[in-house]
Amino acid sequence: MPGFDYKFLEKPKRRLLCPLCGKPMREPVQVSTCGHRFCDTCLQEFLSEGVFKCPEDQLPLDYAKIYPDPELEVQVLGLPIRCIHSEEGCRWSGPLRHLQGHLNTCSFNVIPCPNRCPMKLSRRDLPAHLQHDCPKRRLKCEFCGCDFSGEAYESHEGMCPQESVYCENKCGARMMRRLLAQHATSECPKRTQPCTYCTKEFVFDTIQSHQYQCPRLPVACPNQCGVGTVAREDLPGHLKDSCNTALVLCPFKDSGCKHRCPKLAMARHVEESVKPHLAMMCALVSRQRQELQELRRELEELSVGSDGVLIWKIGSYGRRLQEAKAKPNLECFSPAFYTHKYGYKLQVSAFLNGNGSGEGTHLSLYIRVLPGAFDNLLEWPFARRVTFSLLDQSDPGLAKPQHVTETFHPDPNWKNFQKPGTWRGSLDESSLGFGYPKFISHQDIRKRNYVRDDAVFIRAAVELPRKILS
């Protein structure tokens, strides 16, 4: 090794320094022929290169003339130095010869762990390492008393069968770990256990109450039909479909039959009651027919207009006109409409080929009063002004429409305008209209766009009443 590389309290004298490494000489030797001194290691390295001359004066060297210099070594070892760990905090200083003795006790000196673990650390950190960190340290378990190395103790810790622990199911019980498995499977009130019937898992202290309500709990048929037991959730289906002794209603119950008997006897009842059941079915059909008629009537009432204005489209005009020419007095009827809400119910009729004085030459229009739902609340006879219009379908942007319009005031003495049902008896109501046999001629109806796309539009408007009788 080259010379000493330490922190000297005083600068070493030059004669103590090795000419080769420039440091205070370690194990100095002297060349007796010239008197020069060197570190033994430095001189050996110099000569190993094949140069056998003194490094200082270049005179030939002879190994036999190189001797140790103990006096110089005493002087070098007496030089005062600081500890090599002074920068880390060690305050020791003393002769160089005492350094090794100091390092044997210096708390800052790095030494290997005495337990022969791979760690090297300062002497002052050794106690904590030996107590807490060293994998080779010896530890005794506080629960079972066994001795372990640090590595083995880490595996043992938290697994010791003698350690006192709480139940993992949080039932509050505390016991040695070795008893925990038996407790969890057979003693713990919070352990899970499958239901005997439905196989779902429940906490042990609730499974008893569950089993009394379990849908798969076997129960006996209350009718004692002899099938043994069925699951509770299947019992309604059993009573309804499978139990031969269950009381059932007659399949004609919706028709009015109230008979009830065991399922086994129901077939006999049905066979013996064909005529009564048929009578019930006929009565039911009759009631349903009446209800259907009433619903249709109510639906028709809802679809009837109630603002006193009717716009009636007569489609397929050409075909229907030809039919009217082939069948004299063929009459077309409009949908019914009300003069207002809770008002008079009216209907317009048309003879496309005319009737009476207009037959064969004109379009005839009439209006008649129909029996309405509110007739008892209205003034009679009907006396509201009525206006008929045949609408001109010409484009309003090209020409002003020229509707054909006629207005009349009903004659209060005319029977057609009396309250319906008070006088008509069995008369044919289709002949009771009032209007115009010659509303417009066939010749005039073709002059403008009164017929367009094979359809005509007829408008009927009724003057709104001023009051309803209370």
Curated annotation (Swiss-Prot):
The modification Phosphoserine is found at residue 426. GO terms for molecular function: identical protein binding; protein kinase binding; signaling adaptor activity; thioesterase binding; transferase activity; tumor necrosis factor receptor binding; ubiquitin protein ligase binding; WW domain binding. Expressed in epithelial cells of thymus, dendritic cells of lymph node, and in the basal cell layer of epithelia such as epidermis, nasopharynx, respiratory tract, salivary gland, and esophagus. One of its GO terms (cellular component) is cytoplasm. It is a peripheral membrane protein. It catalyses: S-ubiquitinyl-[E2 ubiquitin-conjugating enzyme]-L-cysteine + [acceptor protein]-L-lysine = [E2 ubiquitin-conjugating enzyme]-L-cysteine + N(6)-ubiquitinyl-[acceptor protein]-L-lysine. The keyword Transport does not apply. CDD domains: MATH_TRAF4, mRING-HC-C3HC3D_TRAF4. There is a cross-link at residue 263 (Glycyl lysine isopeptide (Lys-Gly) (interchain with G-Cter in ubiquitin)). Pfam families: TRAF-mep_MATH, zf-C3HC4, zf-TRAF. InterPro entries: MATH/TRAF_dom, TNF_rcpt-assoc_TRAF_met, TRAF-like, TRAF1-6_MATH_dom, TRAF4_MATH, Znf_C3HC4_RING-type, Znf_RING, Znf_RING/FYVE/PHD. Pathway: Protein degradation; proteasomal ubiquitin-dependent pathway. Polyubiquitinated, leading to its proteasomal degradation. Ubiquitinated at Lys-263 by the SCF(FBXL2) complex, leading to its degradation by the proteasome. It is found in: Cytoplasm; Nucleus; Cytoplasm, Perinuclear region; Cell junction, Tight junction. Its EC number is 2.3.2.27. Residues 307-462 form the MATH domain. GO terms for biological process: apoptotic process; cell surface receptor signaling pathway; innate immune response; positive regulation of JNK cascade; positive regulation of protein kinase activity; proteasome-mediated ubiquitin-dependent protein catabolic process; regulation of apoptotic process; regulation of canonical NF-kappaB signal transduction. Keywords: Apoptosis, Cell junction, Cell membrane, Coiled coil, Cytoplasm, Cytoskeleton, Developmental protein, Immunity, Innate immunity, Isopeptide bond, Membrane, Metal-binding, Nucleus, Phosphoprotein, Repeat, Tight junction, Transferase, Ubl conjugation, Ubl conjugation pathway, Zinc, Zinc-finger. The coiled coil domain mediates homo- and hetero-oligomerization. The MATH/TRAF domain binds to receptor cytoplasmic domains. Adapter protein with E3 ligase activity that is involved in many diverse biological processes including cell proliferation, migration, differentiation, DNA repair, platelet activation or apoptosis. Promotes EGFR-mediated signaling by facilitating the dimerization of EGFR and downstream AKT activation thereby promoting cell proliferation. Ubiquitinates SMURF2 through 'Lys-48'-linked ubiquitin chain leading to SMURF2 degradation through the proteasome and subsequently osteogenic differentiation. This is TNF receptor-associated factor 4. It comes from Homo sapiens (Human). The gene is TRAF4.
